[in-house]
Amino acid sequence: MLFSSMVSAETFSIQSAQIIPIGNGHILNAEIKYPLTLRVKEAIENGVPITFSQQFRLIKSIPILGKYWQWNETLWSTEIRYKLHYHALTQQYLLVDLDTRHQRNFSSLSGALKALGRIEKLSLPPKYLTDLDNLILQIRSGIDLNALPTPMRPGALISSKWHLTSPWVAAKWH
């Protein structure tokens, strides 16, 4: 039992994820915890850029044999990627949204990770939300190991200290 709690303490986790109706659409609010291993923290402190991925997928669950067996069809999926790195000269942590290029500065790593883990008012595609029956929105987050600098990649790919991806978690509909 001790081993399983140690393993889960070193992986990312979705603390909460709620889908809220707003106007004619729906938004997602979620909170993700990012406990980093010492190896990942050291890399960040030494200026290595780390790319975080937040993945979302909307699934239509079609019952085949009642609740015992269901066919899942992915209707929509997307990914939001952020790069986090440390600037030694300014002693700031820089968090960049790789889609919009919007960047924010933080004086502490914990502040940057807290901001990274806060998903607020993420719009969901209305074209798939006309019939909410049997719809599941899943979310997970991890580190994109393929975005690491080339010399670091092989070691990171085989080391458990870099594999921190959370399991898929279903958001709650409100």
Predicted regions and their residues:
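A beta-strand/beta-hairpin structural motif
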Residues: 28-33, 83-88, 99-100, 104-129
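Structured domain cores in non-transmembrane regions
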Residues: 40-107
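Short structured motifs
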Residues: 12-18, 38, 67, 81, ...
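Residue-level recognition of well-ordered beta-strand positions that form the cores
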Residues: 29-33, 53-57, 85, 138-142
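N-terminal onset of structured domains
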Residues: 9-50, 59-63
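N-terminal signal peptide c-region/cleavage motif recognized by signal peptidases
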Residues: 4-6
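Glycine-rich, aromatic-bearing surface loops/beta-hairpins
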Residues: 121-174
